[in-house]
Amino acid sequence: MTDNRFSPDSTPPDASSPDSPVDTIASTQLPASPLTYADDMLNCQTLKQQLELFQLWLGSEFRSGVSAEKLIDARTLFIDRLLQRLWYFYGFENIAQTSLVAVGGYGRGELHPLSDIDVLVLSQTALSEEHSQRVGQFITLLWDLKLEVGHSVRTLEECLQEGRADISVATNLIESRMICGDVALFLTLQKHVFSDEFWPSSAFFPAKIAEQQERHQRYHSTSYNLEPDIKSSPGGLRDIHTLLWVARRHFGATSLNEMVGFGFLTEAERKELNECQSFLWRIRFALHLILPRYDNRLLFDRQLNVAQLLQYQGEGNTPVERMMKDFYRMTRRVSELNQMLLQLFDEAILALDASEKPRPIDDEFQLRGNLVDLRDENLFIKKPEAIMRMFYLMVRNRDISGIYSTTLRQLRHARRHLASPLCTIPEARQLFMNILRHPHAVSRALLPMHRHSVLWAYMPLWGNIVGQMQFDLFHAYTVDEHTIRVLLKLESFADEETRPQHPLCVELYPRLPQPELLLLAALFHDIAKGRGGDHSELGAQDVLEFAALHGLNSREAQLVSWLVRCHLLMSVTAQRRDIQDPTVIQQFATEVQSETRLRYLVSLTVADICATNETLWNSWKQSLLRELYFATEKQLRRGMQNTPDLRERVRHHRLQALALLRMDNIDEEALHHIWSRCRADYFLRHSPNQLAWHARHLLEHDVNKPLVLISHQASRGGTEIFIWSPDRPYLFAAVAGELDRRNLSVHDAQIFTSRDGMAMDTFIVLEPDGSPLAQDRHEMIRHALEQALTQRHYQHPRVRRPSPKLRHFSVPTEVNFLPTHTDRRSYMELSALDQPGLLARIGEIFADLNLSLHGARISTIGERVEDLFILADSDRRALKPELRLKLQERLTEALNPNDKVPLS
């Protein structure tokens, strides 16, 4: 760990070229310039060969350590020379007042290996038909060479008309560059493009800001998506381009260096932006070298190859995680600089509120519009704790929406020159706790503190998780971004508008005696990720030290530490344990100890799930957590030693169901005949409403024949499917396979067999998007299941094609048997790679080994499934050790991802 670990502004060691020198001597000979090509070489086949040689040379040079900047310049020059040679070959130099102009990225001179080559054929007057045909042949040849050429053929007047009407065309023209042809014509175009009649700065600037905002929204306003677009994601190359476009239009600056001369960029900021651009260029260049066609997305299947090409080291996914950590940190810096510089441009170009005087807030700060500003630009350097005073001011003053550009510049400067972390200053610690105690702590202070790297400057541990990704399909965000989203979700529980989505949490949150302790637990719940070891245990220790430093008493410190250590407990218990088993509830309640701790924990659990992945939270998970919460609350109120009377519960369920059925004037004798066939477990694990629903239909049905019921009301957050059928081997596998083939995910299964051998199985299913089964699919699913039940012999179900994304993940199959309080059941946990037909395959193995399944709880976590199965042997007893071992071997063999889902 380096001495500047609390500094968020240090350049990653891999930012220029990890483990390799930059700009080493060329390892292969530079291909000849296209200007030297003889006429007989200017055919498609020969030119293709020359282009392939040049691409190979680019790759070889890059791998030998030559900088991306030099190779981008080299490709731009090579394409310039090729187009110049072809321009003369086609005789365009003889056409008066005609020019070939590079526009867009090509105009900027930024040609990566697969970049588009955008050109404009510019003429004073419309081309003749003959000349137009010749231009068509020229462009067709470029396309035949497999170059990504975008072209337009326009007169000067057409260019100006199109440019005035379309900001994208205008931007292309602003960064246009002459390749060959009539220089005077090109200069005339430039003169018009940079005149106030074309796109005045006062119109161009807001248009580019709106364009950037729209682009950011497409990427959910974060560069932290785990498959980012290097060019277009927030903090990517486009954000640097936006600065250059505005500077070029307003100041005439053609580079970052020239922006320093105009006084709108300091030398340090220029250097930082160049570092960021250089890093992003290296990643983009490497990505283009491994792809067959143009794309800028760092998809999962590309990340390892790019990381290896950039010489990131480590086992397994470590190279990817290191590269992506550097990427996210760089994009954070670009985003902050982009925000600050655009605000400076805003003042210079639009001169907003120039006449409005700043309004003093106190001796240190003032308001400019709705932005907080320093009254003494050296305050942060002289008194670093004033940084925390500013954020405490922001949390208390709802009129403040952000930080003024020059103050942000001073904040960045002071941040870099901190002698020690801010949390070492007593006043800063007091201010931090005051911030946490405010109802709007997250949105008004912690979020901007994170955005401007002040959280990192305050507590060095935070810096460890900034940009920390996890190479899986479950975690949609980096650890720091996820943590901020947890905090925002917790703050939303204080808002009545959140009640429809989270009724329980909105009810409980105001009853928490100290919400700041929950925020502190959220801040630390994943702080130890990426360090090795159990992140929950390590984080619990970290927060104890933090609590001691910040003056929390023993009770407060122990509560926060317990929340961090047990932040996964409620989620795991609800989703991967049998929460209808009183012993499970009793064990969970013993760990929780009090209703107050239960309220804190359920709030943290819900926020954690919601902030992990946008698709993760659904009504099924909500119903599980509510069920666990209320069962635990009841247990805590009853007392830990008092377990529920199961016989009384069975009796109560039967009486309640009977009362419901009597309203329908049912035949009670026939009902008694059906119920007498059922074991006590059936009544214990179904609600009175479920029992009545089953009975109504069974009373009207030939009970010796199969019956499939699909509930029209979402039950426990999903659609309930009830199956009544003569029991037989492979029945569960057949049903699970049919549901999987219909693209339904099973989340829960309750398996019962009547005294006379009838299967009475209940499945809770969801659509792929987490919603209950669509009404228009009910009849089709019911018919398909009836067909499966009537088949005399089990047939392996046809399996859906696996998701392409699953190809890039390997999850070892793990089988674990949980300790139980009974000798009648075994509780088996299974972790494996998610794959089509998985549940059916598992069911086949159970049937092969003559095991009976009594319940299943299915959790899909990204590319991984983590399931719980309740099993018994053929004698209705718990599995003996030798049978457990055999089952483990069969499951591991059948679900091995290397056999089932090919890895790239």
From Swiss-Prot:
CDD domains documented for this protein: ACT_ACR-UUR-like_2, ACT_UUR-like_1, HDc, NT_GlnE_GlnD_like
Ranges of residues in domain ACT: 720-801, 827-904
Cofactor(s) recorded in Swiss-Prot or TrEMBL: Mg(2+)
GO biological process, one term: regulation of nitrogen utilization
Catalysed conversion reaction: [protein-PII]-L-tyrosine + UTP = [protein-PII]-uridylyl-L-tyrosine + diphosphate; [protein-PII]-uridylyl-L-tyrosine + H2O = [protein-PII]-L-tyrosine + UMP + H(+)
InterPro entries: ACT-like_dom_sf (IPR045865), ACT_dom (IPR002912), HD/PDEase_dom (IPR003607), HD_domain (IPR006674), NT_sf (IPR043519), PII_UdlTrfase/GS_AdlTrfase (IPR013546), Polymerase_NTP_transf_dom (IPR002934), UTase/UR (IPR010043)
Protein name, per record: Bifunctional uridylyltransferase/uridylyl-removing enzyme
PROSITE patterns: ACT, HD
Regulation: Uridylyltransferase (UTase) activity is inhibited by glutamine, while glutamine activates uridylyl-removing (UR) activity.
UniProt-listed Gene3D superfamilies: Hypothetical protein af1432
Domains as described in the record: Has four distinct domains: an N-terminal nucleotidyltransferase (NT) domain responsible for UTase activity, a central HD domain that encodes UR activity, and two C-terminal ACT domains that seem to have a role in glutamine sensing.
Chain segments carrying region Uridylyltransferase: 1-360
Listed Low complexity bias regions: 7-23
Biological role stated in the UniProt entry: Modifies, by uridylylation and deuridylylation, the PII regulatory proteins (GlnB and homologs), in response to the nitrogen status of the cell that GlnD senses through the glutamine level. Under low glutamine levels, catalyzes the conversion of the PII proteins and UTP to PII-UMP and PPi, while under higher glutamine levels, GlnD hydrolyzes PII-UMP to PII and UMP (deuridylylation). Thus, controls uridylylation state and activity of the PII proteins, and plays an important role in the regulation of nitrogen assimilation and metabolism.
Keywords: Hydrolase, Magnesium, Multifunctional enzyme, Nucleotidyltransferase, Repeat, Transferase
Annotated source species: Pectobacterium carotovorum subsp. carotovorum (strain PC1)
Segments for region (Uridylyl-removing): 361-719
